[in-house]
Amino acid sequence: IVPPDVAQLQMQAAQASGDATAMKRAATALQMSQYYDEARRFSSMVTERSRTLDTPIYVVTGGGPGIMEAGNRGAHEVGGRSIGLNIVLPHEQAPNPYITPELCFQFHYFAMRKMHFVMRSIALVCFPGGFGTLDELFETMTLVQTGKSRARPILLFGRAFWEKLIDFQHLVDSGMISAEDLGLFHYVETAEQAWERLAEHYGFDLSGTVEGDYSDDS
C-alpha cells in the first residue's frame, strides 16, 4: 500500500498510457492508499496521546515499506520514537527511513520476529495486508484464544476488506470456533475509533490519562 500522493501519480501515468489493466491496478492502489494515511494518523495519535502516560506507548512495525512505513512515519512526524522489527529477505526489504535508528532490529527468522511482536505488544492493529499480516493476526488470536498469551485489543482496520477476505461467521456456523471467539477482535475504520478501543480496554481517557495499568505483562 503506497501513500496517496504516490498512488495519484501512478493513476496519472496509467491514464496517460491508456492501458486498461494498468488503470484498474492504479485505481485499486489509489483506493487502498487511504489506509496508508489512516495508519500514519493512528501512529501519530498514539505517540502524542501516550506521552502523558507513565509508560509511553511505542509503535512497533515490521520495519518495511507500505503500511509499516506509515506507522513509523506517523510517530516520526510528531517527534516520537518508534520501533522496526525488520526481516532479512532475498528480494526485500530495506528498513524504512522513519524508524528510530537505534530501535531498528534485523531478524533472520520469522518465528523469532513474531515472538517479539507478541511478547512486547499491548495491542495488535492490522491493516489490509497479505500472507504476513494474516500469519501475525491468526498467531496472535490463537495465542489469546488458548490462554498462551494475555488478552489485548486486536483491531482490524477496514471491515469491508476483512469481511470479504475472511468469513469468520462461517467458522462459527461450521463449529470451528465458538461465537465467543468473535469477541477476540474488533473492526475499526478510523484512527479515532482505534484509539477509543485502546482507551476502553486499558482505562485511559481519550487524551491519554491512564486510570489502570496497561503495561501488565502477565
Per-segment meaning from a language model:
Residues 79-92, 127-128, 141-165, 179-180:
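Short, acidic/small-residue loops that bind anionic groups at enzyme active sites
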Residues 156-218:
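C-terminal functional extensions of proteins
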Residues 55-58, 151-153, 182-185:
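Residue-level recognition of the N-termini of beta-strands and the immediately preceding loop/turn
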Residues 60-61, 65-127, 131, 138:
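Phosphate/pyrophosphate-binding betaalpha-module
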Residues 1-85:
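Glycine-rich beta-alpha loop segments
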Residues 76-77, 139-144, 170-173, 202-203:
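Short, solvent-exposed amphipathic alpha-helical segments in soluble enzyme
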Residues 11-25, 108-124, 141-148:
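Glycine/serine-rich loop-strand microenvironments at binding/catalytic pocket rims
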